[in-house]
Amino acid sequence: MMWRPSVLLLLLLLRHGAQGKPSPDAGPHGQGRVHQAAPLSDAPHDDAHGNFQYDHEAFLGREVAKEFDQLTPEESQARLGRIVDRMDRAGDGDGWVSLAELRAWIAHTQQRHIRDSVSAAWDTYDTDRDGRVGWEELRNATYGHYAPGEEFHDVEDAETYKKMLARDERRFRVADQDGDSMATREELTAFLHPEEFPHMRDIVIAETLEDLDRNKDGYVQVEEYIADLYSAEPGEEEPAWVQTERQQFRDFRDLNKDGHLDGSEVGHWVLPPAQDQPLVEANHLLHESDTDKDGRLSKAEILGNWNMFVGSQATNYGEDLTRHHDEL
């Protein structure tokens, strides 16, 4: 799920130095703008043939799942038991795992990449270690220290950098819900991953419009849409896939058929309604493991179907937790 991310996030991903300035041309383009929920796993959902890799990756997260092919069945079951205890403690602690608790666990594992990126940002940008990230801290670490009125005097294309700075500040102000110019961890998460927060939806749409609306009429025309995907060489025939994109624009992007995209249509495109994948998988695991059909799972029921949840060397899909269980 993506559009052009903030300069700060690009900086983190590229591992620039604290004073290194970002490229004005940085950022993904084209179809990468669309913020769609990533699948819980790229593996086929093929339980009928004993392939539980999809379920393992959905339950544990893909990165952790890869680490556990070497576990014995006994190790897998023991560690799964600890996960079951933790799922219940995170909920109502009644000794059972409800559908809501199972869904919350799966959603938690799937958000690990977001938590990791925020932790990296936090460690880098909370320079005074006061437990908050101020706009001044973030700005200076990202763009460098400048005296007032001298911003970017030492770089080419200073105007582009000024626009980037203004854009990041605007996003920060929207993420900073209490308006104190100091980001809590939740507010920094909204800054880095605005697609995850309903109150940030308008800023994602505004940034996308600014990127694509070259004639500044407030809309995305079909040629502006195509220009973000494809740049033709002189004399080059337009590829078939570009023609397909034009048709996609007319048939599926331009909802009211007026020939261009307004803000609402841009939002529908880059932030489409998403299926609750963790809930779908939680329902599946509950259905397959709830032997007494009481609508909840006991620890015994989960361990009785342990190879669907985690596996081991014995199944060739072992995937639980070489991380300490408190990290999951």
UniProtKB/Swiss-Prot annotation:
Binding site for Ca(2+) 6: 290, 292, 294, 296, 301
Cited CDD domains: EFh_CREC_RCN3 (cd16230)
Assigned keywords, A-Z: Calcium, Chaperone, Endoplasmic reticulum, Glycoprotein, Metal-binding, Protein transport, Repeat, Signal, Transport
Residues annotated for Ca(2+) 4 binding in this entry: 213, 215, 217, 219, 224
Pfam families registered for this protein in UniProt: EF-hand_5, EF-hand_7
Signal peptide positions on this chain: 1-20
Annotated positions binding Ca(2+) 3: 176, 178, 180, 182, 187
Cystine residue pairs: none
One Gene Ontology molecular-function label: calcium ion binding
Annotated TM spans: none
Taxonomy, superkingdom: Eukaryota
Cellular compartments annotated: Endoplasmic reticulum lumen
Induction behaviour: Down-regulated by aldosterone (at protein level). No effect at the transcript level.
Family under the similarity heading: Belongs to the CREC family.
Name used for this protein in its record: Reticulocalbin-3
Species name: Homo sapiens (Human)
